[in-house]
């Protein structure tokens, strides 16, 4: 059968004769028996191009990939820098924030967003003929707190206007706002590197706030493709403030940082209950570009001229969306202008994950919206005494809190100070300060050196150890789960070296899981108190570790590779009874035995 196949396949016969057969090649195939086992002269048949390539070790592949990625990032940075040098980006932001109120702006209906759809609706909310707006004075208080916290001038007299447009989420055919005479003007927000501004913006950026105005929210739409859309009018007339910044932002990262900072300020003064993550805050960005080497643009906004034609990107619902949408629109406008096109004023949309914005409609202006004073609402009069009282009652601003926590009193890093302020509406910060105060009282008998790092140590335990337990258990913050006094006692025992760090974490976990025994009693009952090793016990452990690794000892002595002492410390801690070997004492004994250096007097 093989001979028949070979007769039908002359190429195969030639291959076998030339590669595998011994003896004269002119001989007959019948006189050349086929080998019964693999022979070193048999060649493997390549069936794919990839198999013939030289094998590259995995480590080398990873290095090559990392190098290529690094080069790609460098090229991207260089391209962005070249673009930044050629084109100037200008961004202004409009932030819509739902106020922390129990009633709607112009009716007594509830603002609860958890009730059944269309259950909190007054006649005016649905624009029933003959219904009139009734301004709810309590809705003004959180708006004033926000404006004061954003350094605005509160206007003693402001007025309401009608902004006309027809859309299914606005039953009246107009929105009540404060276009001509807002209640707050001329504010600002300061941004710093820890807020996330772009490195090109330096150490400080101040973004002006043109105005803050009260206005109604619209109904909530819910689409059911292909053709059904449901409306929940519970949200109609929910009190909003619209915060309009000046066009003084020139970097996408700084635009996102500005929105993030404003949200943090609004939350710190209880002006809002939720942020972007739950839909309580939305942002529109106005984007324009112009060439730096050409004459200033012909457009102006908020008193700032020389700008290019702007476009507006609506309803951005996250900080990342703000940054990505600005980048996408900047790139689109640059591409249009470099190809000889013209930027048109229009409203555009952006979808999460997209790299392009899309046109929604032409940009409406003042004439299109037909602004007019609302004849059913009187002027809004705000007294100086009310503003002064609210100003005095505001909590410490976030920037001042960060400065305090990073100062000499607490000594925290900016990275630890920020989450303490931002987490849990200030409850985490209050808990931390309680822990520090109690801990300082417990440590009054200790020397100044021992007490110096108490606040930093407490910050680590509150944020990372206790915070990590909450995250692992997927539980909301609860200051009573581990009372501040209990955590302070655990840290005190650790600081006095009565327990090890591992034991302290074990005790914290026990209390977190519900153990309510006092800390001293718990330590005694569970036999967790540290029994220090004697000097002889340390020497025995060190000699055992040294005897097992003579080559490493010689490297430390001959080449002065002191970093390897840490490895021996780890070996001693593993060999000794859990929690009893102290790293500092182990290091001292090792230096004495290996280097002949002793810290003993």
Curated annotation (Swiss-Prot):
Complex formation: Subunit of the heterotrimeric GatCAB amidotransferase (AdT) complex, composed of A, B and C subunits.
Q: What is the lineage of its organism?
A: Eukaryota, Fungi, Dikarya, Ascomycota, Pezizomycotina
The subcellular location is: Mitochondrion
| One example of a Gene Ontology biological process annotation | mitochondrial translation
Function of the molecule: Allows the formation of correctly charged Gln-tRNA(Gln) through the transamidation of misacylated Glu-tRNA(Gln) in the mitochondria. The reaction takes place in the presence of glutamine and ATP through an activated gamma-phospho-Glu-tRNA(Gln).
Q: Can you name the source organism?
A: Neosartorya fischeri (strain ATCC 1020 / DSM 3700 / CBS 544.65 / FGSC A1164 / JCM 1740 / NRRL 181 / WB 181) (Aspergillus fischerianus)
User: Which protein, by its recorded name, is this?
Assistant: Glutamyl-tRNA(Gln) amidotransferase subunit B, mitochondrial
Give the range of the organelle targeting sequence. 1-52
Q: Which GO terms describe its cellular component?
A: glutamyl-tRNA(Gln) amidotransferase complex; mitochondrion
- Name the InterPro entries for this protein: Asn/Gln-tRNA_amidoTrfase_suB/E (IPR017959), Asn/Gln-tRNA_Trfase_suB/E_cat (IPR006075), Asn/Gln_amidotransferase (IPR018027), Asn/Gln_tRNA_amidoTrase-B-like (IPR003789), GatB (IPR004413), GatB_Yqey_C_2 (IPR023168), Gln-tRNA_amidoTrfase_suB_CS (IPR017958), Gln_synth/guanido_kin_cat_dom (IPR014746)
Stated EC number for the protein is 6.3.5.-
């Amino acid at each position: 059968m093989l001979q028949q196949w070979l007769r039908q396949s002359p190429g195969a016969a030639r291959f076998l004769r030339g590669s595998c057969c011994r003896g004269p090649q002119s001989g007959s195939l019948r006189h050349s028996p086929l080998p019964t086992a693999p022979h070193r002269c048999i060649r493997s048949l390549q069936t794919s191009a990839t198999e013939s390539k030289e094998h590259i070790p995995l480590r080398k592949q990873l290095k090559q990939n990392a190098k290529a990625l690094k080069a790609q990032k460098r090229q991207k940075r260089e391209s962005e820098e070249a673009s930044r040098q050629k084109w100037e980006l200008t961004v202004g932001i409009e932030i819509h924030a739902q106020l922390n109120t129990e009633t709607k702006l112009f009716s007594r209906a509830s603002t609860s967003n958890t009730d059944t759809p269309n259950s909190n609706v007054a006649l005016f909310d649905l624009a029933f003929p003959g219904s009139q707006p009734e301004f709810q004075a309590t809705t003004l208080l959180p708006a004033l707190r926000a404006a004061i916290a954003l350094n605005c001038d509160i206007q003693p007299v402001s007025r309401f206007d009608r902004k006309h447009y027809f859309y299914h989420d606005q039953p009246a055919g107009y929105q009540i706002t404060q276009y001509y005479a807002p209640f707050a003007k001329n504010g600002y927000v300061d941004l710093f590197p820890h807020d996330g501004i772009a490195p090109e913006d330096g150490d400080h950026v101040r973004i002006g706030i043109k105005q803050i105005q009260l206005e109604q929210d619209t109904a909530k739409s819910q689409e059911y493709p292909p053709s059904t859309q449901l409306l929940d009018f519970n949200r109609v007339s929910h009190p909003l403030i619209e915060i309009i910044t000046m066009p003084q932002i020139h970097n996408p990262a700084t635009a996102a940082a500005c929105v993030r900072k404003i949200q943090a300020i609004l939350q710190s003064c209880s002006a809002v209950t939720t942020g972007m993550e739950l839909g309580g805050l939305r942002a529109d960005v106005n984007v324009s570009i112009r060439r730096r080497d050409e004459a200033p643009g012909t457009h102006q906004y908020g008193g700032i001229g020389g700008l290019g034609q702007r476009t507006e990107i609506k309803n951005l619902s996250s900080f990342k969306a703000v940054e990505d949408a600005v980048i996408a629109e900047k790139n689109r406008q640059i591409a249009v202008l470099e190809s000889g096109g013209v930027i048109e004023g229009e409203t555009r949309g952006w979808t999460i994950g997209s790299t392009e914005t899309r046109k929604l409609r032409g940009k409406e202006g003042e004439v299109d919206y037909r602004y007019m004073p609302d004849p059913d609402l009187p002027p809004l009069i705000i007294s100086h005494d009310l503003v002064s009282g609210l100003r005095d009652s505001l909590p410490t601003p976030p920037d001042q809190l960060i400065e305090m926590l990073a100062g000499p009193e607490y000594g925290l890093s900016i990275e630890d100070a920020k989450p303490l302020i931002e987490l849990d509406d200030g409850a985490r910060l209050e808990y931390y300060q309680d822990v520090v105060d109690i801990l300082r009282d417990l440590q009054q008998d200790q020397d100044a050196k021992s007490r110096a790092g108490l606040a930093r140590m407490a910050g680590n335990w509150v944020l990372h150890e206790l915070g990590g337990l909450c995250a692992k258990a997927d539980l909301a913050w609860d200051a009573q789960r581990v009372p501040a006094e209990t955590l302070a006692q655990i840290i005190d025992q650790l600081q006095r070296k009565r327990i090890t760090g591992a034991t302290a974490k074990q005790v914290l976990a026990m209390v977190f899981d519900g153990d309510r025994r006092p800390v001293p009693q718990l330590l005694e009952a569970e036999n967790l108190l540290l029994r220090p090793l004697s000097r002889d016990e340390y020497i025995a452990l060190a000699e055992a570790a040294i005897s097992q690794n003579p080559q490493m000892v010689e490297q430390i002595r001959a080449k002065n590779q002191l970093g390897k002492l840490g490895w021996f410390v780890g070996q001693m801690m593993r060999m000794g009874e859990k929690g009893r070997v102290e790293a500092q004492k182990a290091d001292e004994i090792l230096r004495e035995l290996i280097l002949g250096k002793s810290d003993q007097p």
